[in-house]
């Protein structure tokens, strides 16, 4: 007689995509996008992810993703133009290297229009996706340059050149962290950020 194991493995995979649009009404329609700036996988803070899952199962406070954070410490451009990437922060009391801006993405807690989360599942499969969306409109963040073709922008020091993003709970646990080639946010650009977390069960 074969005894069925009560154990299974949980794996979380993440993927980030940043798409630029010119008009807010086009957001979500990739056929009208200006360009895709980032399309890559992310790193997961395994300890904090385990805390998040346990809280969600027990229906406890801070058991969901609450904010998407943007930073400027994920990459450095050297004098020769080479991009040096920082190692994603996935252990201990981790945070973004240089956090500068965030968006609330929990649409059950007054997230701005366009920011939302959704769960997607295909019957019969052993994975489910959490799709987390944030839209940074033309007037966000305050103080950015009017156009992205303005000269003199320092890719290493500007507060509006993002090169790292992380997802956090409301009590500030960093669950994911991804670094990427610097992307400048200016007032002529609308960014849609789609962050997908795939929760996979392996028996």
PLM regions and their residue ranges:
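Small cysteine-rich, disulfide-bonded extracellular modules of the LU/uPAR three-finger superfamily
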Residues: 1-162, 171-203
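Generic short beta-strand
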Residues: 164-166
């Amino acid at each position: 007689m074969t005894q069925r194991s009560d154990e299974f493995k949980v794996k979380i995979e993440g993927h980030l995509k940043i798409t630029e649009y010119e008009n807010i009404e086009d957001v979500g329609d990739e056929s009208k996008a200006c360009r895709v700036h980032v399309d890559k996988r992310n790193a997961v803070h395994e300890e904090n992810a385990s805390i998040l899952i346990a809280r969600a199962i027990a229906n406890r406070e801070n058991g969901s993703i609450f904010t998407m954070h943007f930073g400027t410490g994920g990459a450095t451009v050297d004098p020769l133009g080479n991009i040096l990437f920082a190692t994603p922060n996935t252990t201990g009391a981790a945070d973004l290297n240089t956090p500068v801006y965030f968006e609330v993405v929990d649409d059950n807690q007054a997230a701005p229009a366009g920011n939302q989360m959704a769960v997607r599942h295909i019957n019969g499969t052993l994975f489910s996706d959490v799709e987390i969306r944030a839209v940074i409109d033309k007037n966000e963040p305050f103080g950015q340059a009017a156009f992205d073709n303005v000269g003199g922008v320092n890719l290493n020091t500007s507060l509006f050149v993002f090169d790292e993003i992380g997802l956090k709970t409301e009590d500030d646990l960093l669950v994911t962290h991804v670094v990427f080639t610097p992307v400048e946010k200016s007032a002529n650009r609308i960014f849609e950020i789609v962050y997908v977390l795939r929760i996979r069960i392996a028996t």
